[in-house]
Amino acid sequence: MCNTNMSVSTGGAVSTSQIPASEQETLVRPKPLLLKLLKSVGAQKDTYTMKEVIFYLGQYIMTKRLYDEKQQHIVYCSNDLLGDLFGVPSFSVKEHRKIYTMIYRNLVVVNQHEPSDSGTSVSENSCHREGGSDQKDPVQELQEEKPSSSDLISRPSTSSRRRTISETEEHADDLPGERQRKRHKSDSISLSFDESLALCVIREICCERSSSSESTGTPSNPDLDAGVSEHSGDWLDQDSVSDQFSVEFEVESLDSEDYSLSEEGQELSDEDDEVYRVTVYQAGESDTDSFEEDPEISLADYWKCTSCNEMNPPLPPHCNRCWALRENWLPEDKGKIPEKATPENSTQVEEGFDVPDCKKAAASDSRESCAEEIDDKITQASHSQESEDYSQPSTSNSIIYSSQEDVKEFEREETQDKEEIVESSFPLNAIEPCVICQGRPKNGCIVHGKTGHLMACFTCAKKLKKRNKPCPVCRQPIQMIVLTYFP
């Protein structure tokens, strides 16, 4: 008899290497329910080998088409005799241990010394050999042979995949040299659920004939000597020809070496890896200004349109719904601003005219008069300081400090007045007013980097810079404020 081996797979399939050789060659008698299932697909005996049980079980699944059309490794047997036999509504062909256990529960070991069973087995084996070629010729095909158990033990990290052509030994009385040569070849019977896809294939591989069987001259049939296939679930663990690929991997550790395809002679190198560097830039500005995400603008800053009662953001002068101009967006009386901005001695300047061109005196005259008054005050303070140095030496220092502070305050007020005069000298019809104070023209350019925004007056822009506020338009930090002159 031929020794059959079921290799140990990574998925945990049952290995016949752990089962005694006598048990592998033992005939089994299916239980009544399993026997009924086997006879429905052509079985005619009462005792079978494990190979024959798997063969007829595959024929039953193929005939009834119990497998899923899309995921064909799944077998549905809830409303079938197979479901009553296994006790499960469905199972996967990749669960080798589970399938072997379900089959083995429905078998009874038969003593080989019984003459009736052995004679029946021999007669049925001969009949099976005669009809074996007709039964398997339509479905024979090239398939990949998985490594034997000895190969898996010696090389657990690699899987050799070879293609073998099914062949049958026609002459039992070959020469010893030919038999020695043929015993290294494997005979495979391929029966698939779907012949077009070659899915769920039943493979029965005849193992090497032992030297003891050759010495004793035990007759062997190559079609029936292959007891149980390499894996107990290999008859259900085959994918379609297009889906045949290995999914072998190992858990990587510090001591593990680089993975290489030794069978194909290909090695993975660093050149095969492609590294892409992606840089993400955040947009600084957009075409449309949004005030909804601005934390400094609250609902109290929104203005209500008098025409349609729509609440609008503070900066746009027009209503977003009806496009009406905001009420009091521009001052009604345009002559009030220059009157407020002119100094006290502006009445005297307006009354005087130049003789040649009959024009009003320029603002430079007022500046000169202010400068003369400052000089007079400074000289008076110096004279009073000298006189008091002799009379009251104890209070001279306080007088000096007070006079200097008065001069500094006066100069500060004068510069502010000059800035207001310059700002108010622009015609309001030429430019829009400041969006912050709504009174002075937009002449304070907020500069940040190489760009700037002209949206406020010089005074309001300086206040923003002094308080370390960002630009109201683009939210960038303010670097400087530039006073802008218009022609």
From Swiss-Prot:
Location of region: Interaction with USP7: 223-232
Residues that the record marks as modified (Phosphothreonine) are: 415
Q: Which residue intervals are annotated with compositional bias (Basic and acidic residues) in the record? A: 126-148, 164-179
Q: Where is the composition biased (Acidic residues)?
A: 252-274
Chain residue ranges for the region called Region II: 242-331
Q: Which UniProt keywords apply?
A: Apoptosis, Cytoplasm, Metal-binding, Nucleus, Phosphoprotein, Transferase, Ubl conjugation, Ubl conjugation pathway, Zinc, Zinc-finger
Which modifications occur after translation, per UniProt? Phosphorylation on Ser-166 by SGK1 activates ubiquitination of p53/TP53. Phosphorylated at multiple sites near the RING domain by ATM upon DNA damage; this promotes its ubiquitination and degradation, preventing p53/TP53 degradation. Autoubiquitination leads to proteasomal degradation; resulting in p53/TP53 activation it may be regulated by SFN. Also ubiquitinated by TRIM13. ATM-phosphorylated MDM2 is ubiquitinated by the SCF(FBXO31) complex in response to genotoxic stress, promoting its degradation and p53/TP53-mediated DNA damage response. Deubiquitinated by USP2 leads to its accumulation and increases deubiquitination and degradation of p53/TP53. Deubiquitinated by USP7 leading to its stabilization.
Chain residue ranges for the region called Sufficient to promote the mitochondrial pathway of apoptosis: 1-101
Per the UniProt entry, what are the Gene Ontology biological process annotations, in alphabetical order? apoptotic process; negative regulation of apoptotic process; positive regulation of mitotic cell cycle; protein ubiquitination; regulation of biological quality; ubiquitin-dependent protein catabolic process
User: Which family does the record assign?
Assistant: Belongs to the MDM2/MDM4 family.
Q: Which PANTHER family match?
A: E3 UBIQUITIN-PROTEIN LIGASE MDM2, OS05G0521000 PROTEIN
The identity of this protein, by name, is: E3 ubiquitin-protein ligase Mdm2
Q: What organism does the record attribute this protein to?
A: Canis lupus familiaris
What broad taxonomic lineage does this protein's source fall under?
Eukaryota, Metazoa, Chordata, Craniata, Vertebrata
